[in-house]
Amino acid sequence: MTAMTNIYETTIIGGGPAGLYAAFQAGLYGLNGQLLEGDQQFGGKVATYAERVIHDIGGMPNITGQDLIQNLTAQAAFYDTPLRTQTLVTDVKYLADQDYYQIDTPDDRYYSQTLILAMGGGVVRPKQLRLFEEQTFENVHYAPANPEDYRDQRVVLIGPGYNLMELAPHLLATAKSVVWLTTKRPFVDEAAEKAFLTAYPQIDYYCQPLASYQQVDQQVTSITLADQTQITFDQAVVSLGYRRSLQTLDQWQLSAEQIEERPDIWVIGNQIPDRAGISLLTSAFQDGITAVTEIVAQLKPTAKTPMVTTHNPVFQADTKAYWQERLR
C-alpha cells in the first residue's frame, strides 16, 4: 500500500469494545476507516474473562464477554470496514508536509488522516506457566473457552484465577472429568473453599506445587504433583493472570505530546487517563461516538447526520432477518 493508492479517513488502533464500536460508528457515518488489532483475536481485556457474565451494560441485564465480543465484531463488520487482527502497530509518525499519519506494522504500511487510539492498557498477554518453560502445546489453553469445546474430555484447570472458579462448574456438564490444580488458594478463606468444594464434589482439587510434566509430541499428557500424584488429562486450561503492555506505543515516533495536543487524534476507552476510577463499557461506547462525530465535522463539515438506525434503510435486510428469526 502506498500513500497514493489509499489514505484512510480514520484508523482505529485497538480492537477491544471501544475500538469495535468506534468502527461501527465510522461505517454508520460514512467514513473510510480501518481497525488494527495486534492480538490474534478481538476483545481486548474482555477476552480475558470471556466466559464471565457482564451485568452493567444498559439494556443488557446479562451477557458473557464472549457473546459481547461476537456481537460487537459482527456490528463493526456491518459496513465492510477492514478489521485486521494480528496487525501490531510498531510505529506511527505524523507526516507534516502531507498532513496525514504513516502507520507501520510488521507486514504493511498504512496512511490515515486521523487516528482513534483505543488501546486500553495495551496488548494483553496471558502469564505463562513456568513449568512448561514457555513451550507451546496443542492442548494447553491460556484463554478459557466455551465449556462445549471440552465435551467428553478430561480437563485439568491450572492456576488460582477467578476465571477457573467460574469455568469449573460449567465444565461438569460437558467434560468427562475436571481436576483443578493450584499452588495458591483462590478462595477468600477456608469457609469459602469448603463451600465451593461441597457444592461441586465432582471437581478433584489439589493445592500443591507442580513438580513435572509428561508429553507426547506436542501435547502434555500428564502432570506430576509434589506428592507424586500423577494427573492425566486431554486438555489443560491455565489462568495465572495477564500482562498488559503499551510498550509499542512508547516506541512510536508519534510523541505523547502530539497524542495529547494534535486535533486529529482521539483517545477513547480505558486509554483515557484520569477517569476517576470509572471503568464502564458504556463509557467506551460513548467515547467512540464522540470521536467519530468530531472527525466527520472536521473532514466533512457539510455531511448530513445519518438517519437513526431504526429507520435507516441500510438496516432493512438486517431488520427483516431479525424479525424472521424472532417469529419462528
From Swiss-Prot:
Any single Pfam family the record assigns to this protein: Pyr_redox_2
EC numbers: 1.18.1.2
Any one GO molecular-function label of the UniProt entry: ferredoxin-NADP+ reductase activity
Signal peptide per UniProt: none
Record's cofactor remark: Binds 1 FAD per subunit.
InterPro entries (alphabetical): FAD/NAD-bd_sf, FAD/NAD-binding_dom, Fd--NADP_Rdtase_type_2, Ferredoxin-NADP_redctase_2
Cofactor(s) required for function per UniProt: FAD
Residues holding FAD: 37, 45, 49, 89, 310
Top-rank EC class of the record's enzyme: oxidoreductase
Catalysed conversion reaction: 2 reduced [2Fe-2S]-[ferredoxin] + NADP(+) + H(+) = 2 oxidized [2Fe-2S]-[ferredoxin] + NADPH
Keywords associated with the record: FAD, Flavoprotein, NADP, Oxidoreductase
Domain of life: Bacteria
Assembly, per entry: Homodimer.
Family: Belongs to the ferredoxin--NADP reductase type 2 family.
Protein name in the entry: Ferredoxin--NADP reductase 1
Organism: Latilactobacillus sakei subsp. sakei (strain 23K) (Lactobacillus sakei subsp. sakei)
